[in-house]
């Protein structure tokens, strides 16, 4: 523990906050290419086949990203835009794919919360 004198001379160093989405490098979105598209199962009490993609970003980092919504058209070599935001029941998944941008199509027949899934307004 420092003495009062040491604190007067040096002071306390403020703690740096660690980023929850380090691969984004302070950007709101990042572009990347799918290297693998697959399904995975969530942690205990939940049960499902969650759609995820391994993505090589423009800063040459590899991240696992969740594909939201029902059905998708992604495959290997698809170019996607990702945003931060983890999926609580999938360990290691800290990013989301943006729907309706670049090679990702919006969710078909989506009526509510359309902007989050890149769906156009139904006629």
From Swiss-Prot:
Q: Which UniProt keywords apply?
A: Methylation, Ribonucleoprotein, Ribosomal protein, RNA-binding, rRNA-binding, tRNA-binding
Q: Name one GO biological process term.
A: translation
**Gene Ontology molecular functions:** rRNA binding; structural constituent of ribosome; tRNA binding
Q: Which domain of life is it from?
A: Bacteria
- According to the UniProt record, where is the region Disordered? 1-29
Any one GO CC term of the record: small ribosomal subunit
The record, for InterPro entries, names:
NA-bd_OB-fold, Ribosomal_uS12, Ribosomal_uS12_bac
- Which stretches are annotated as coiled coil? none
For the modification 3-methylthioaspartic acid, the affected residues are 89
Q: Which CDD domains does the record cross-reference, listed alphabetically?
A: Ribosomal_S12
Q: Name one Pfam family in it.
A: Ribosom_S12_S23
Q: How does it assemble?
A: Part of the 30S ribosomal subunit. Contacts proteins S8 and S17. May interact with IF1 in the 30S initiation complex.
What NCBIfam families is this protein classified in? rpsL_bact
| Protein function | With S4 and S5 plays an important role in translational accuracy.
Which family would the database say this protein is a member of?
Belongs to the universal ribosomal protein uS12 family.
Identify this protein by name.
Small ribosomal subunit protein uS12
Originating organism: Novosphingobium aromaticivorans (strain ATCC 700278 / DSM 12444 / CCUG 56034 / CIP 105152 / NBRC 16084 / F199)
Gene from which this protein is expressed: rpsL
């Amino acid at each position: 523990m420092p003495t009062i004198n040491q604190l007067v001379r040096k002071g306390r160093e403020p703690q740096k906050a660690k980023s929850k989405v380090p691969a984004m490098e302070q950007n709101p979105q990042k572009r990347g290419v799918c290297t693998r598209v697959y399904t995975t199962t969530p942690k205990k009490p939940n049960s499902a086949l969650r759609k995820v993609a391994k993505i090589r970003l423009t800063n040459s980092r590899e991240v696992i990203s969740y594909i939201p919504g029902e059905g998708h058209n992604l495959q290997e070599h698809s170019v996607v835009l990702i945003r931060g935001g983890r999926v609580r029941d999938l360990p290691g998944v800290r990013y989301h794919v943006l729907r309706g941008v670049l090679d990702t199509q919006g969710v078909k027949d989506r009526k509510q919360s359309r902007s989050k899934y890149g769906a156009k307004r139904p006629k």
